[in-house]
């Protein structure tokens, strides 16, 4: 929640026992987002959708967006009383599905997302709303799953790519048996 613009609400989740419910505090705007502790790579979802369910008064305009680790922000508009991205604005629970190519904008780095979901209202509307079922879909297909339990007969050094944004990298390798290993990195 940004700058104390929202407090806990009382709207029950759409389904199950968990959801998000907030009430605006009358600050003239409100904003909040779902932020990961480390940047998330959602590049495989570039042709997918950001989906969510929301219960919000029909007369409240809002924006849904994403923010990358570089501070780039991009939003799509949900005008009051208009069906947008499949969300029917009647004050009841409804679902929206935003194509990632539309919410991404020109500068969002999907490989380094800090906020995977942001809601923002800037017209000063006071309201209570609920969010549920926030997820990204269409991230590609698994091409092949191999469940081979074969025993290694040779050393294997897997591809290792350092993260240029972090001084640490993980180096994965396999050896044919148990034992002490001395690894030197140049």
Model regions: which residues?
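Glycine-centered coil/turn sites that cap beta-strands in beta-rich domains
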Residues: 146-161, 165-184
């Amino acid at each position: 929640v940004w700058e104390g613009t929202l407090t806990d609400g009382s709207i029950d989740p759409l389904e199950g026992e968990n959801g998000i419910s907030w009430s605006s505090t009358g600050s003239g705007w409100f904003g909040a987002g779902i932020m990961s502790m480390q940047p998330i790579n959602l590049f495989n979802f570039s042709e997918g959708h950001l989906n969510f369910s929301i219960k919000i008064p029909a007369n409240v305009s809002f924006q849904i967006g994403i923010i990358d680790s570089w501070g780039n922000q991009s939003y799509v508009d949900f005008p009051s009383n208009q069906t947008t991205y499949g969300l029917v604005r009647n004050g009841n629970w409804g679902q929206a599905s935003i194509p990632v190519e539309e919410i991404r904008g020109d500068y969002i780095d999907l490989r380094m997302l800090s906020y995977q979901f942001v809601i923002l209202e800037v017209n000063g509307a006071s309201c209570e709303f609920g969010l549920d079922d926030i997820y990204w879909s269409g991230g590609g297909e698994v091409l092949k799953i191999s469940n081979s339990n074969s025993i290694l007969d040779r050393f294997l050094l897997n591809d290792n790519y350092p993260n240029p944004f972090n001084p640490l990298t993980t180096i994965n390798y396999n050896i044919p048996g148990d034992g002490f290993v001395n690894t030197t990195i140049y």
